[in-house]
Amino acid sequence: MARLGFGLVSCTFFLAASGLYSSSDDVIELTPSNFNREVIQSNSLWLVEFYAPWCGHCQRLTPEWKKAATALKDVVKVGAVDADKHQSLGGQYGVQGFPTIKIFGANKNKPEDYQGGRTGEAIVDAALSALRQLVKDRLSGRSGGYSSGKQGRGDSSSKKDVIELTDDTFDKNVLDSDDVWMVEFYAPWCGHCKNLEPEWATAATEVKEQTKGKVKLAAVDATVNQVLANRYGIRGFPTIKIFQKGEAPVDYDGGRTRSDIVSRALDLFSDNAPPPELLEIINEDVAKKMCEEHQLCVVAVLPHILDTGAARNSYLEILLKLADKYKKKMWGWLWTEAGAQSELENALGIGGFGYPAMARINARKMKFALLKGSFSEQGINEFLRELSFGRASTAPVGGGSFPAITAREPWDGRDGELPVEDDIDLSDVELDDLEKDEL
């Protein structure tokens, strides 16, 4: 059973944006500033709820969550993250709906989704079951407890995506590259560097995956590579610098947690990435590439060219503008003409609201959400924003699989032309005959 999904949440009213828990509760409030210290670097088993204060399901869970936290006190840690306020932390763990509950066991980098009931008793049972399994794993030697990757600089498996640079390799890799580089200058004996290492290593893997290698994380042993250390004025450890082609390096002054580093890297990627492609659905390859190779894809169905003429370009301009605005999300963007992909429209229930129409598809889960507001920059922006926060309702794609796509020629960019009617030759028609017919 999957965790509470994007489409199973129906939080339909808002409350003041205040947390559901207080310091007097046994539930530990978690934020980006303390999450790594409290959870990731802990040997304890953690149950963490990602919630939004306005969510009705979260409000109903609150007393049960508090009850479980009290029962499990000093046995299992029970925490909560306001994911509406701390979106970077929710995004880091793929939170798309509220509440989402995750169990952080031996491997804190791979939490498990909680699949049980929402009562205090069910939560306690699940926690004790997970704790029992953790102890068994430790007894059998399969787990050493805390495993966030703190194996030291010599263990390449813990930092496989961190690129080690030297005086000899730095210029070719960094200065001659079109990619963005975040480079840590460290000293092996430095305690702060050792604390940063697992965060840097884990962030490197996430950044590589999310930016397709366009932002790279690297490390330089400044005690050995003193040419580089002197060139960039390294006086303390760790020092992190950001290198972008054609620009002077700048110091990274953000937080030292994985989420902080990933967030900054994605901002750099967004600033430097070109706008996403907006492709017309002309065959199955185009549709599946944009939907199956991206976490989500946005599909617009525009009116027939004979119904809009030059207005089609206005619609496309709106889509391009919003694709650029949301490029950090790395969604796929598609459009088609009304009636051109009838099976796709049927599978998404498009057409009932008229055209233009829009749907957002999660091809992995075969779920979609429809735009029910205005097809305008403001209306679409609000739709996409609600989706980002997990507030929009979704439904299964009709048929349970990606619909068949009809191959067609791409739009040539010109206005449509009405079919020309054949001229009728009236030379053989006798007017006298017409007058008789009228009589």
From Swiss-Prot:
Signal peptide limits: 1-19
Entry's EC annotation: 5.3.4.1
Protein name per UniProt: Protein disulfide-isomerase A6
Keywords attached to this entry: Cell membrane, Chaperone, Disulfide bond, Endoplasmic reticulum, Isomerase, Membrane, Phosphoprotein, Redox-active center, Repeat, Signal
GO MF annotations in UniProt: protein disulfide isomerase activity; protein-disulfide reductase activity
InterPro entries assigned: PDI_thioredoxin-like_dom, Thioredoxin-like_sf, Thioredoxin_CS, Thioredoxin_domain
Job description of the protein: May function as a chaperone that inhibits aggregation of misfolded proteins. Negatively regulates the unfolded protein response (UPR) through binding to UPR sensors such as ERN1, which in turn inactivates ERN1 signaling. May also regulate the UPR via the EIF2AK3 UPR sensor. Plays a role in platelet aggregation and activation by agonists such as convulxin, collagen and thrombin.
PANTHER family given in the database record: PROTEIN DISULFIDE-ISOMERASE A6 (PTHR45815:SF3)
SS bond list: C55-C58, C190-C193
Phosphoserine: residues bearing it: S129, S156, S158, S427
Top-level enzyme category: isomerase
Location within or outside the cell: Endoplasmic reticulum lumen; Cell membrane; Melanosome
Gene that encodes it: PDIA6
Catalytic reaction(s) noted: Catalyzes the rearrangement of -S-S- bonds in proteins
NCBIfam families on file: pdi_dom (TIGR01126)
Residues the UniProt record annotates as site (Lowers pKa of C-terminal Cys of second active site): R256
Family: Belongs to the protein disulfide isomerase family.
Domain Thioredoxin residue range list: 20-133, 151-287
Any one GO CC term of the record: plasma membrane
